[in-house]
Regions:
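Anion (oxyanion) recognition and catalysis
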Residues: 31-34, 101, 158
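Flexible loop/turn connectors
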Residues: 127-210
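Short acidic/polar active-site loop segments enriched in Thr and Asp
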Residues: 12, 74-76, 140
């Protein structure tokens, strides 16, 4: 419905970011294809000839996260992933497992979101982690596939008396400004978000209808 509203306003282009239901979004866009409005999908790759994709290599991001945690000695690791129905979340998780495997580290615990990543998801993930490990030693590190989720996990751990990184290490994803605004500051995997935005706008401007 939202896409139909945008099209009705004679827009020059559409940039879609953080698509949750990829199948439904693609179908809605294809139904409006005759309007010849340029469409840019940000953050994941969707193989439709009339769409442009601007995305980083999500598999490589996962590998980098796994290799980093493995290289500093972590053997028992947890992660909070995006919704399993999304390709980007699956790619990051596959890469993460492969990166850990290079250091004989184990992905011991996984929390898959059922909705878009946000602060509440991070709190829910940490609650689930604590429930699953009640009376047992926690994994030594957590990779949150979003800095907002990482900040929520940090808050939950701190509230429960755990120290980051002394008791448990925490790694985020995206490298947004929030990482420097929390205590302690978050380690994170960098995403070139400014460059992604600039490239998306460039594509729209070059392909907007006459």
């Amino acid at each position: 419905e939202l896409l139909n509203t945008y099209f009705s306003r004679n827009i020059d282009g559409i940039i879609l970011y953080l698509i949750y239901d990829e199948t439904r979004a693609v179908q809605s866009l294809l139904e409006q294809e005759e309007r010849r409005v340029p469409v840019v999908i940000v953050g994941r790759r969707i193989n439709v000839d009339s769409f442009s994709n601007v995305a980083t290599d999500n598999y490589l991001a996962g590998v980098m996260a796994g290799e980093y945690l493995g290289s500093i000695g972590h053997k028992r690791v947890a992660t909070v992933t995006g919704p399993r129905i999304t390709q980007w979340a699956r790619d990051r998780l596959d890469g993460f497992r492969d990166g850990l495997a290079k250091y004989q580290a184990q992905l011991e615990w996984q929390y898959s979101q059922t909705d878009l990543p946000d602060f509440e998801t991070g709190l829910a993930a940490c609650d689930a982690l604590m429930a699953d490990y009640a009376g047992r030693a926690l994994p030594t590190a957590i990779w949150a596939q979003n800095d907002i989720i990482a900040a929520a996990v940090l808050k939950s751990l701190t509230n429960q008396g755990y120290r980051v990184p002394e008791d448990i290490s925490l790694l985020g994803m995206d490298d947004i400004q929030l990482c420097t605004m929390v205590t302690p500051m978050l380690s994170t995997i960098h995403q070139p978000l400014r460059e992604i935005a600039q490239e998306s706008i460039r594509i729209i401007m070059e392909n907007e209808p006459g």
